[in-house]
Amino acid sequence: MSDGDEPAVGDRLDALHEQLAATAERPVARAASAHLGEAEAVARDLAERPADPDTVRERVGHVVRLLREAGDTEDERADEHVAAALELAEGLIAELADSDGEST
């Protein structure tokens, strides 16, 4: 796969943040709200501040854990944003892990 096949990591971090920021506009369950808010804050920080690949992978992994722990949002559109964010985050982790493993 060439570099032109997928958006740059920075663009996908922006998209991750946008998906999570969109959940803040939705009437989500209180129990899910704290997890989503923390995940959105981590994603915002990643989108705004450059970091080395290991740090990005670690922090995106934290986003994934938070999203999985969020539970039911009780809002279908928020669930769609969470699913899209999870897909983006898991893809980023896989890509960053693959780039680490290329030398092995």
What are these regions (language model features)?
Residues 1-104:
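Acidic, polar-rich N-terminal leader regions of halophilic archaeal proteins
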